[in-house]
A protein has these predicted regions:
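Nucleotide-sugar donor-binding/catalytic module of glycosyltransferases
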Residues: 1-191
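Intrinsically disordered, low-complexity segments enriched in small/polar residues
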Residues: 52, 177, 212-213, 230
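Alpha-helical interaction segments
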Residues: 53-54, 205, 221-222
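Surface-exposed helix-capping loop/turn segments at secondary-structure junctions
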Residues: 81, 215-224
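Catalytic core of nucleotide-sugar-dependent glycosyltransferases
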Residues: 110, 179-219
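Membrane-interface aromatic/basic loop that binds lipid-linked glycans or pyrophosphate carriers
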Residues: 220-235
């Protein structure tokens, strides 16, 4: 495993060095640029590492014991029939609070999301369900993800490159990690009331502004007209 730190000011570096003493397989990428945020941080680290398969991990996630083996088994079944294709395997998550109390046992179910219905670029670009810390992807998927534009989240970028290249995204409808939702998340889930229609109606101005800002970003990826965006957003 490879670790990078984005410029922590607490005792994170000390914790990392303690892990290095415990396991010589861990590599600390200390020389990578700092204070660049999650998307550039993950992509920058990906660019430096050569492997057959890749997985991302956030520092406060709790991986369930079956996470790696389940993802690898599903990947291997796909790879046997598609040895040259970019492949992404990803899973559902359970959302928990700071003390690991469950807020959502299935994030997909809570959001009424069926990833298998969203596997084309027009949908995926506006509803990127492939969460980075659940993904396992191969070197072919890495290869087509560079050069990186620098303007999009790492999981969105890799997943949309795979779809655009006619690769394969496979969804596993089993939570494989506990996603910790707390006040210090750089990026967090919306859960409960914030996913409900009445909440969005009551906060319609924010919803519209958020969607307009998001459209401006994906337009840079040649998404198409705002009418197309609205059509796929409401379908």
């Amino acid at each position: 495993p490879y670790i990078r730190d984005d410029g922590s000011t607490d005792n994170t570096i000390e914790i990392i060095h303690n892990y290095l003493l415990l396991d010589n397989r861990i590599i600390f990428c200390e020389k990578l640029e700092k204070h660049i945020g999650p998307q550039k941080g993950f992509i920058g680290m990906l660019e430096c590492v050569e492997s057959e398969l890749y997985m991302f991990c956030d520092q406060d996630d709790v991986w369930l014991p079956t996470k790696i083996q389940l993802s690898v088994d599903v990947y291997n079944d796909i790879y046997v029939k598609n040895p040259c294709k970019p492949i992404v395997v990803h899973t559902d998550v359970a959302v928990v609070d700071e003390n690991l109390a469950v807020l959502e046992s299935s994030h997909w179910l809570s959001c009424r999301l069926n990833p298998d219905e969203l596997k084309n670029y027009n949908y995926l670009a506006i509803c990127c369900y492939t969460q980075g810390n659940t993904m396992l992807f191969n070197k072919e998927a890495k290869k087509i993800s560079f050069p990186y534009s620098g303007e999009f989240m790492h999981d969105w970028w890799i997943s949309t490159r795979v779809i655009k290249s006619k690769g394969i995204i496979k969804s596993i409808y089993i939570p494989t990690l506990l996603y910790r939702q707390h006040s210090n998340n750089v990026l967090g889930f919306k859960y409960g009331n914030s996913n409900r229609i009445f909440y969005k109606i009551l906060n319609i101005t924010n919803v519209i502004n958020d969607n307009l800002e998001f459209y401006k970003n994906i337009r840079k990826d040649n998404y198409g007209s705002v009418l197309k965006f609205v059509w796929y957003k409401i379908r």
